[in-house]
């Protein structure tokens, strides 16, 4: 139930503050959650979500392909949010819907604010960026800048995000007393469900390097 306090939540397992997305960015509901409540939700426009069947009358990628700005290559043909068809169906919560192009700025800003507010005490910050997960929709600052299509552009955006966090630590003179860990939950995947020309625009880039496999595999590159 996204219309009231969400249970369970990260405070239940020891976090003091949370600003998260409920699923992955290619899944509904496309909203932010702050301290167990959907950000900007109008109680008169409640959210309904279902992964088994359509709810509401919002356009879908399957029924309204003319309404999408990013076409699916596999799956990803359910409710259209911000011109992008997602996994699952939702309706309601219009005032709370995110704009994909702004997600990196918003999450990075929240992380910087957290660091600044805890600069005088020990803190633990877990920041999970949406890049380079699909849909790959960079902010206009990065769109078209990599020469490798949207996938390359969001890698640039991710690099900017990391730089912003590092610069914040440096500006507060706490970088030398901070352990910074950068890691991924899985290896690379090129075409992950949207027609974003990731394969066509690799331009010699080999994300897996000399390792076997990739995301969804049990080999080294997975």
Give short role names for the model-derived ranges:
Residues 1-93, 209-212:
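Catalytic-site neighborhoods of secreted/periplasmic enzymes
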Residues 2-13, 134-154, 167, 171-222:
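Histidine-centered active-site microenvironments of extracellular/periplasmic hydrolases
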Residues 10, 14, 102, 106, ...:
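Extracytoplasmic/secreted proteins, especially bacterial periplasmic and envelope-associated proteins
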Residues 17, 122-123, 177-179:
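Proline-centered loop/turn at the N-terminus of a beta-strand
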Residues 21, 114-118, 130, 145, ...:
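Structured segments of extracytoplasmic/periplasmic soluble domains
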Residues 28-29, 34-37, 109-154, 189, ...:
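Active-site His/acidic residue clusters
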Residues 66-137:
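Anion-binding catalytic surfaces of enzymes that hydrolyze or transfer phosphate/sulfate esters
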Residues 111, 127, 162, 180, ...:
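Conserved hydrophobic/aromatic pocket- or pore-lining residues that grip, position, or stack substrates
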